[in-house]
Amino acid sequence: WEGKKIIFPEKTQFALYGKDFVFDTIPDAEFKILTYVDSTGCASCKLRLPSWLDFIAQLDSMKLNVPILFILHPFDSRELKAILSRDNFNYPVCMDTKDEFNKLNHFPPDFQFQTFLLNRNNEVLAIGNPVHNYRIKEFYLKMFLKGDLENETGDQTTIEANTTINLGHLK
């Protein structure tokens, strides 16, 4: 995924609580985080909205201009809007009811690999969710403070798709 350019549908609209329109252009910033969440299974568990609010507050307190693009593919829009409202999530989200983002980008099926650190050109620099993994969060914060990927050491999260599985010898 590293270096892959994320494609945005022509009409991408972000709104508060999934209903009050805020903006429809992708922010131009050195870094941005894109997180895609489909609502199969426990949407609230995947989203962890209170943790995202804490992370956003941390970025703001550090005066880091890093937009976070929440792309939500709801199974039930009303339920997802209720979750946003219940958690007082006052940050814009894109309700992708037609799953256009996934159709254009073919995101990995594992939700742990559906959050991406993007550069100004929407190319993937890293993959991983900073609210689900403390080490990812620390890595992202280092990136934002340094401004580049040069000289990074330590563990990095990668994903590789392998379409063949060796089942051994069958008798």
Positions of PLM-derived features:
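Extracytoplasmic
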Residues: D28, K63-N65, D110
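Structural microenvironment flanking redox-active thiols in thiol-disulfide oxidoreductases
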Residues: G41, K46-R86, E100-K103
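Thiol-/selenol-based redox modules, centered on thioredoxin-like
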Residues: Q112, L117-K171
